[in-house]
Amino acid sequence: MVGFGLGTLRYVPEESKDKVTSDEDVLGTLLKVFQALFLNDFNKQSEILTMLPESVKSKYQDLLAVEHQGVKLLENRHQQQSTFKPEEILYKTLGFSVAQATSSLISAGKGVFVTKGLVPKGAVVSMYPGTVYQKYEPIFFQSIGNPFIFRCLDGVLIDGNDKGISKVVYRSCNGRDRLGPLKMSDSTWLTSEIHNPLAVGQYVNNCSNDRAANVCYQEFDVPAVFPIELKQYLPNIAYSYDKHSPLRCVVLVALRDINQGEELFSNYYTIVS
């Protein structure tokens, strides 16, 4: 493997090529969550809505009407919308919520926990955010002392560090790809106010002898048909602009039912080179 200085890499082992959940199910979950987030933020989406086809606008208005059937006044609807936090939307949509907290492992720092509900086996429980690098792209300086670099099977790297030069690079790419009010990715995972509640996968700790893995990493390429108005919730962006290649994402999938209060543990290898 090419040296990465003092950096460490997480990666999907070769024997994990078989996907726990189909790409269709992963896509379905992301669309379901992102659409719910979009509807929850509907009164903030006016600029984006003006750029969408009438058929798409009508679809969201119909969905919103169904969601708020019992609400007669527009003001009340907006007031009701503003009461839901992203993690509450996640719970309403998938039946569980996850969040960062101090890990149950000594000296492990942050971890990710199921804060409410039950995660069923096979469910997408979080996403691994960050800048996506092709294997030929420069990442040496970003990798120094960086424990948040994830290596995919094909050598694609995802830098999930929310600090330092990694943060600067992500913000720069995020601004580069923006089309007026249309954001091609979500940068709020770099802040304390996360809009996509799934974007906490970089803080999932490795399993240990007494803490078996309950989630696994799974690669997912965003299809070309992904709704442009929902890309604002994707917590990944390509280092180099390339409209022809699909965006690589990595999701974490439950290996078993995971109960409220449990910490998520993955199975990754750390390589120091």
Curated annotation (Swiss-Prot):
Family: Belongs to the class V-like SAM-binding methyltransferase superfamily.
Annotated S-adenosyl-L-methionine binding sites: Y268
Example GO molecular function: methyltransferase activity
Alphabetized UniProt keyword annotations: Methyltransferase, S-adenosyl-L-methionine, Transferase
Domain of life: Eukaryota
This protein's name: SET domain-containing protein 9
The enzyme's E.C. designation: 2.1.1.-
Classification lineage: Eukaryota, Metazoa, Chordata, Craniata, Vertebrata
Residues annotated as domain SET: 96-269
GO biological process, one term: methylation
Disulfide-bond pairs as recorded: none
